[in-house]
C-alpha cells in the first residue's frame, strides 16, 4: 500500500514540478532597480589546475563497484546468520550453510550494479535473473537433501518477487523514479499506521467499541473501514513530513550521497520482504532481519577515506539541445554518472534531465512552494548561485551535479559564468539546426573560452554540422 501510494504521489509531484519549472523558465523577473547598473565583475579566484585522468576514473569506478558488492555480501551473510538463528532454527547454523544462504540473500547486489552503472531496468532485471540462476545452481549443489527444481525455483522467486515489484513501481518510470525514493518514507509510515490500526480493530471484532458500531451504522461498513484506515494519517502526517525533511537536510549537509540513499532504500525493501514472510512463523523475532541494514551507514562512514578522490577535481559543463529528453538522459547515464567519480558537473537546469538531477532538497523546496527562489534574476544572483555550488565530494567519493536555474532573461549571464568555471565542456548537438539560436549563442561563447582544456561536441546524422562549426 505504501509503495502504491508513493508511486501515485510521485507521478503527480513530478508532473507538477515539471510544469512549474517550465512556467518559471519562460517567465521574466520584474526589473530590480538595485541592479540597474551592473557592478564590475570581480575576477574569479584562481583555482588549482585540474588533471583529466581516464585511468584514475576507471580505477575509481571498479573500486566503487567492489565496495558496494562486498557490502552486499556482508549484508547477505549477516542476514543468513540471523535467519538461521531466529527464523529457521539455530540447530541448522553452520559456516557452509550461512555462506550459501548469505550469497542467495545478497541478490540485491545485482540491483546495486544497475544503480552504479546506470543500467536500464531491462538490463538490471536480466542481471538479477542471471544472479538467481547462479544461486539456483549453488543451492542445488549445496543442498543436504535433494530438492525438486520447482521447490528451489519457488523459494528463490518468493525471495525476490516483492522487492523487485516494489523497485519496479518506484523506479521503472523515470517520472516516478525522480521523486519516489524521497517520498517513500512518508507513505510507508502512513501505510504502516493504517495496517496496524486495522489489525487492532480486527482483533476486537467480537466485542467492538460502541463508537465503531455507531460509525458503521452511520456511514456503512466500507466507508467506516476507510475512515479508520486513514484516521492515523492525521496524527502521523506531520512526524512523517518532519522525518522526510530531516533526510533532505542531512543530504544537503552531505551526510550521505544520492546513490547510497537509493542503495539503503532498496536494501530496506529487500530485508523488509524477508521479515514480513517470517513474521507469521516467528513473530517479532522476524524483525531481526532488519539488523543487517545497519552495515550500510557503518560502511558509508568506514569507506570514506578509501573512496575519497585525490587531486583537484575538474569541472564539466554540460550543454545540450533542449527538448531532446531521451537522448540527453542516456548521455547523462553513460557519461556524466561516470564522470562524477572524478569531478564536478555543472549545467543550466532544464526539465529534460529532471529524472536524473532532482534530489531530496529539490523535492521539498518545491513542496514548500519555494522553487522560484532557486531561479537567478540578475547577474549578481548568478554569482551568488555559483558561490553556493556544492563542489566537495560526497562521503562515497562521488561529486554532485550543480544546476543553475535561469529565466529566459538570465541564462546568458549564467552561461558566461559557468563557462568561466569549467575545465571541460560536453555539448550534445544531436538534433541541432540553424534555428536553435540558444545553442548557436553557446557555441559562440565557447569559441572565445581559451582556458578550456577540452571541448567535446556530440553530433549525429540530424546535426547541422556546417552551421555548428561556423559558429564555433
Q: Where is each model-derived feature located?
A:
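Membrane-helix interface and helix-disruption motif detector
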Residues: 1, 80-101, 116-122, 138-158, ...
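Hydrophobic cores of alpha-helical transmembrane segments in multi-pass inner/ER membrane proteins
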Residues: 4-11, 100-111, 155-168, 227-241, ...
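Cytoplasmic membrane-interface regions of multi-pass membrane proteins
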Residues: 16-56, 105-127, 161-184, 238-258
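N-terminal topogenic membrane-targeting module
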Residues: 32-48, 257-270, 280-394, 398
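Transmembrane alpha-helical segments of multi-pass membrane proteins
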Residues: 56-73, 121-137, 178-195, 251-272
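Acidic/glycine-enriched connector segments
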Residues: 87, 91-98, 142-149, 365-422
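Glycine-rich, charge-decorated loop segments at or immediately adjacent to ligand/cofactor-binding or catalytic sites
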Residues: 356-363, 458-472
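Conserved TIR/SEFIR loop-to-helix hotspot centered on a Trp-containing motif
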Residues: 432-445
Amino acid at each position: 500500500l505504501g509503495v502504491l501510494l508513493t508511486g501515485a504521489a510521485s507521478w503527480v509531484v513530478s508532473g507538477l514540478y515539471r510544469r512549474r519549472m517550465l512556467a518559471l523558465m519562460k517567465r521574466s523577473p520584474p526589473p530590480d532597480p538595485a541592479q540597474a547598473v551592473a557592478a564590475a565583475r570581480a575576477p574569479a579566484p584562481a583555482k588549482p589546475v585540474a588533471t583529466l585522468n581516464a585511468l584514475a576514473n576507471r580505477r575509481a569506478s571498479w573500486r566503487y563497484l567492489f565496495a558496494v558488492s562486498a557490502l552486499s555480501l556482508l549484508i547477505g551473510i549477516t542476514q543468513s546468520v540471523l535467519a538461521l538463528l531466529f527464523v529457521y532454527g539455530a540447530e541448522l547454523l553452520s559456516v557452509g550453510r550461512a555462506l550459501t544462504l548469505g550469497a542467495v540473500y545478497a541478490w540485491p547486489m545485482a540491483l546495486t550494479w544497475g544503480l552504479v552503472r546506470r543500467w536500464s531496468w531491462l538490463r538490471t532485471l536480466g542481471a538479477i535473473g542471471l544472479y538467481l540462476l547462479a544461486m539456483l545452481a549453488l543451492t542445488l549443489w549445496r543442498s543436504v537433501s535433494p530438492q525438486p527444481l520447482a521447490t528451489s525455483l519457488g523459494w528463490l522467486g518468493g525471495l525476490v518477487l516483492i522487492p523487485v515489484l516494489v523497485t519496479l513501481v518506484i523506479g521503472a518510470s523515470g517520472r516516478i523514479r525522480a521523486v519516489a525514493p524521497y517520498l517513500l518514507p512518508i507513505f510507508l509510515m502512513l501505510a504502516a499506521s493504517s495496517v496496524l490500526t486495522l489489525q487492532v480493530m480486527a482483533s476486537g471484532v467480537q466485542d467492538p467499541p460502541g463508537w465503531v458500531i455507531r460509525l458503521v451504522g452511520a456511514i456503512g461498513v466500507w466507508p467506516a473501514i476507510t475512515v479508520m484506515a486513514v484516521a492515523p494519517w492525521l496524527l502521523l502526517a506531520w512526524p512523517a513530513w518532519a522525518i522526510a525533511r530531516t533526510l533532505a537536510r542531512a543530504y544537503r549537509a552531505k551526510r550521505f550521497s544520492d546513490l547510497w540513499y537509493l542503495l539503503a532504500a532498496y536494501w530496506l525493501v529487500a530485508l523488509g520482504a524477508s521479515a514480513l514472510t517470517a513474521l507469521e512463523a516467528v513473530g517479532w523475532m522476524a524483525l531481526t532481519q532488519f539488523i543487517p541494514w545497519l552495515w550500510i551507514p557503518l560502511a558509508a562512514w568506514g569507506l570514506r577515506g578509501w573512496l575519497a578522490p585525490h587531486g583537484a577535481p575538474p569541472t564539466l559543463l554540460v550543454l545540450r539541445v533542449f527538448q531532446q529528453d531521451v537522448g540527453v538522459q542516456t548521455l547523462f547515464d553513460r557519461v556524466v554518472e561516470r564522470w562524477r567519480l572524478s569531478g564536478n558537473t555543472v549545467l543550466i537546469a532544464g526539465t529534460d534531465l529532471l529524472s536524473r538531477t532532482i534530489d531530496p532538497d529539490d523535492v521539498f523546496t518545491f513542496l514548500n512552494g519555494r522553487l522560484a527562489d532557486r531561479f537567478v534574476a540578475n547577474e549578481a544572483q548568478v554569482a551568488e548561485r555559483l558561490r553556493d555550488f556544492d563542489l566537495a565530494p560526497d562521503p562515497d567519493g562521488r561529486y554532485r551535479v550543480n544546476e543553475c536555474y535561469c529565466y529566459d532573461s538570465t541564462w546568458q549571464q549564467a552561461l558566461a559564468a559557468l563557462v568561466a568555471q569549467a575545465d571541460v565542456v560536453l555539448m550534445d548537438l544531436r538534433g541541432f539546426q540553424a534555428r536553435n539560436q540558444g545553442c548557436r549563442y553557446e557555441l559562440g561563447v565557447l569559441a572565445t573560452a581559451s582556458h578550456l582544456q577540452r571541448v567535446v561536441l556530440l553530433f549525429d546524422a540530424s546535426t547541422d554540422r556546417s552551421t555548428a562549426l561556423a559558429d564555433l
